[in-house]
Amino acid sequence: CLHYGHLQHLEAAKKMGDILWVSVTDDLHVNKGPGRPIYPQEHRAALVKALRCVDKVITVSGLMEALEFVKPSILVKGTDYRNGLADYHEKYCRKHGIRIAFTDTPKLSATDMILEAMKR
């Protein structure tokens, strides 16, 4: 589910470049557990596109597909990726001159927020 942490991350990413492309993982490739995703890819993409900071949205099977389609100059990831992307993502970025940057926004989990709210 789209939440405030996503908005913070996307606003920070927008400040790093001119056009902010956001990739939404398609329903078939979302790895969040049984019964997920809760919302279909079209709904998730529409919600992301509605954010003022987002210029373009694509639905993809994974990061490699997004990189090959967009051909960005910068790949911006959240703090949870600071310990490293998959080796093949890093190699692809190096080979194609794509700078990897990270936002400093805190990692939030929609599932954790929902579970915490249910305890109240």
Which sequence ranges carry the predicted segments?
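Nucleotidyltransferase catalytic core that binds NTPs
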Residues: C1-R120
